[in-house]
């Protein structure tokens, strides 16, 4: 009743009580154009019915001849609503049989009784523009009735439908996995659910013109479907991340009504709550930091042996979670006693604007708000970067920035408290530029090649551990142990899920008992100090690592430090001579990028490097290893305007003078002079290229290789050792000796 109080939105508003469903429907008869009937024997028709209801102002009702059913009370009796759409035959028999031609379409059956109703909807509503593809709903169909006790009773999430019906959204309950049949229909062909979902997402992308993002409410209902709980082969979080990876590829995000806490009621009403134009938050000044003993008089971070701590107060990336936990967390009487960085998605303003408004109006000076994962909606931003796996669509970064900016401006946000990368690539330099445009005071991604970096003026800190111990003392011990493991950087981030202010107060008290050098900060102080600290310690000749202000490289030592900042932007400002260079570990050269854990590994070089027309000279390496080269393994990188002279690369396989294995990389105006790349240390066949190792989805343009040697036992090339069909070599030439040891004497001038 908060909003019924004097001065509040619902003060003195009239309330009408209806005693029966018949009375309620009769009262709103002017808004209801009829009924769409669904068939519980084909559970997916229940979701299709909700989608049709929104598109045509109908009520979705289950066909049921029982005298107390809604069908009997509202169609056969009471207001006698007209049946306008049927997902069941008039005689009550099943319409969708999983064979022949799908009724009402020209398409053959998918072979899946579950999927055919969705194809019917695609043909009759999505392709005809009758639905609003800016909204979608991922909620359980009637299959939940087979095991209603799998989790809390209200996780049927029927109460969540009203908002999405009001938005004319499309509905679905489909598996994101392409390596097993959907667990709710094990006889279907593998990948059928996934194919239908991709078709829906692509249509949404096309109708939204790639400019608007699709807002999906819901979450994989892993207690019921698509995981090991339901007889599948995948665990819970992997299923969450695979769905996330999939929708992100098509410019969609989710408002994550996750399992057990996923129910939400009356959002169609609360969406009309009047928000203020702006909810501002102040940023800390350097003078304030000096007064608090955090900065010295000359503006440097005054560490004094301290470790600075921030808690990610989550997970508030779902309207249902924010709504259900307000009374347990926000209304805790101990809120305000310690600094708390509340991570709440601004896109929740769509369904629970009244809750977000209440937070801002009742916040204390110790309550500060940042965006939760991963901005204005939960998606994998690495899937917005080109090339985009799954969809092959153009970059979605610009449209993501345009989606997030107004949300951040409205709510006074400048920090993205956590970026869940999941199964997606980490942010490359273009992804970093995207976030810098709307989250200038900080981001915390899972995947980062170093613990921290400064991108432009944006501090970037790698996410660390989740700390969710029930007992505050146990949590404090875990925090202290982790901080002591991580020597060096005195800034520490920990994620907590649905913890009360009382828990935080008690954790801080326990920390003081164990180690009083640990200092919990408010979010502005933490990220501003981190920014200053990173400026003080950056090992380059200048710059901040962004495209317009790249890190400046003037010595071999600075060039070697690129490996700690692999996602950023660099420019060479003079020639580099590696004749006498020895790395800090006393070893010979090692490539800047490494293979790492495989696809999308953060150990790969994914930055932007502008050689400025200068040269790298006399770099040499001879090791029994793969991907030996200057830059090593690259992915999503760009290297331009560089000369390489008199360099020697001798190793095992995937060798190149400039790069080893080269993924989704652009190389332009790079000249290799009098250098050698030789595969002489391998015990089996391998490859080498005068410029790069094998190319995958990459482009080389206006490059040359002159003089020198290329030698390999398997594949050898004057430019690259090999390339897949998605790569291009444009306006390049090589004049070098290329030796392919089919026979010891074979050699070719290429």
Regions of interest found by a model, annotated:
Residues 24-29, 203-207, 285-308, 329-334, ...:
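Short boundary motifs at domain starts and secondary-structure transition points
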Residues 193-221, 309, 314-322, 327, ...:
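Catalytic grooves of carbohydrate-active enzymes
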Residues 266-360:
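Active-site beta->alpha N-cap acidic-glycine motif
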């Amino acid at each position: 009743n908060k909003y019924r109080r004097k001065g509040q939105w619902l003060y003195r508003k009239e309330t009408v009580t209806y005693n029966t469903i018949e009375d309620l429907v009769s009262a709103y008869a002017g808004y209801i154009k009829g009924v769409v009937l669904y068939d519980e024997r084909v559970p997916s028709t229940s979701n299709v019915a909700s989608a049709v209801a929104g598109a045509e102002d109908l009520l979705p009702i289950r066909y049921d001849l029982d005298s107390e059913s809604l069908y009997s009370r509202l169609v056969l009796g009471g207001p006698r609503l007209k049946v306008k759409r049927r997902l069941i035959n008039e005689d009550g028999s099943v319409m969708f049989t999983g064979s022949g031609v799908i009724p009402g379409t020209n398409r053959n059956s998918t072979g899946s009784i579950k999927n055919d109703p969705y194809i019917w909807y695609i043909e009759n509503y999505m392709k005809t523009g009758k639905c609003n593809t800016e909204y979608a709903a991922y909620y359980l169909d009637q299959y939940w009735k087979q095991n209603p006790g799998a989790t809390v009773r209200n996780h049927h999430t029927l109460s969540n439908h009203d908002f999405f019906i009001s938005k004319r959204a499309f509905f679905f309950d489909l598996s994101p996995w392409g390596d097993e049949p959907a667990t709710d229909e094990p006889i279907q062909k593998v990948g059928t659910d996934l194919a239908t979902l991709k078709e829906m997402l692509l249509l949404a992308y096309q109708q939204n013109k790639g400019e608007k993002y699709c807002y999906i409410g819901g979450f994989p209902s892993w207690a019921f479907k698509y995981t090991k709980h339901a007889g599948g082969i995948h665990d819970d979080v992997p299923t969450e991340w695979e769905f996330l990876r999939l929708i992100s590829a098509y410019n969609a995000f989710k408002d994550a009504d996750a399992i057990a806490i996923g129910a939400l009621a009356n959002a169609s009403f609360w969406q009309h709550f009047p928000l203020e134009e702006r909810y501002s938050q102040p940023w800390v000044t350097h003078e304030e930091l000096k007064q608090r003993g955090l900065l010295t008089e000359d503006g440097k971070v005054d560490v004094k042996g301290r470790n600075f701590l921030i808690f990610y107060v989550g997970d508030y990336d779902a309207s249902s979670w924010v709504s259900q936990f307000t009374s347990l967390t926000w209304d805790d009487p101990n809120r305000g006693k310690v600094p708390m960085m509340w991570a709440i998605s601004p896109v929740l303003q769509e369904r629970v604007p009244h809750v977000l408004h209440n937070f801002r109006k009742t916040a204390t000076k110790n309550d500060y708000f940042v965006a939760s994962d991963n901005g204005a909606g939960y998606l994998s931003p690495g899937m917005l970067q080109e090339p985009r796996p799954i969809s092959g669509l153009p970059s979605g970064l610009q449209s993501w920035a345009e989606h997030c900016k107004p949300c951040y401006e409205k709510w006074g946000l400048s920090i993205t408290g956590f970026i869940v990368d999941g199964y997606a690539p980490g942010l490359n330099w273009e992804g970093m530029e995207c976030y810098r445009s709307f989250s200038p005071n900080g981001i915390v991604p899972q995947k980062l090649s170093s613990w921290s970096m400064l991108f432009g003026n944006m501090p970037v800190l790698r996410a660390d551990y989740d700390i969710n111990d029930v007992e505050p003392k146990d949590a404090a011990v875990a925090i202290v142990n982790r901080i002591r493991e991580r020597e060096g950087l005195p800034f520490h981030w920990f994620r907590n899920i649905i913890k009360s202010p009382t828990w935080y107060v008690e954790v801080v008290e326990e920390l003081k008992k164990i180690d009083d050098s640990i200092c919990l900060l408010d979010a502005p102080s933490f990220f501003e100090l981190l920014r200053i600290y990173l400026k003080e310690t950056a090992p380059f000749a200048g710059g901040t690592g962004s495209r317009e202000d790249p890190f400046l490289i003037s010595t071999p030592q600075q060039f070697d430090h690129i490996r700690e900042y692999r996602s950023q932007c660099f420019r060479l400002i003079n020639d580099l001579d590696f004749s006498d260079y020895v790395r800090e570990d006393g070893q010979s050269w090692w490539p800047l990028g490494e293979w790492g854990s495989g696809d999308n590994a953060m150990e790969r070089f994914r930055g932007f490097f502008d050689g400025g027309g200068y040269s790298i000279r006399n770099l040499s390496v001879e090791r029994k290893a793969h991907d030996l080269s200057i830059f090593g393994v690259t992915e999503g990188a760009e290297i331009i305007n560089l000369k390489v002279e008199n360099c020697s690369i001798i190793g095992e396989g995937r060798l190149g003078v400039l790069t080893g294995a080269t993924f989704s990389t652009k190389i332009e105006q790079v000249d290799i002079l009098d250098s050698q790349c030789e595969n002489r240390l391998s015990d089996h066949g391998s490859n080498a290229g005068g410029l790069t190792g094998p190319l995958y989805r990459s482009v080389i343009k206006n490059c040359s290789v002159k003089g020198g040697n290329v030698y390999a036992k398997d594949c050898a090339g004057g430019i690259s050792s090999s390339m897949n069909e998605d790569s291009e070599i444009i306006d390049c030439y090589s004049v070098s000796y290329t030796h392919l040891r089919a026979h010891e004497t074979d050699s070719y001038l290429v």
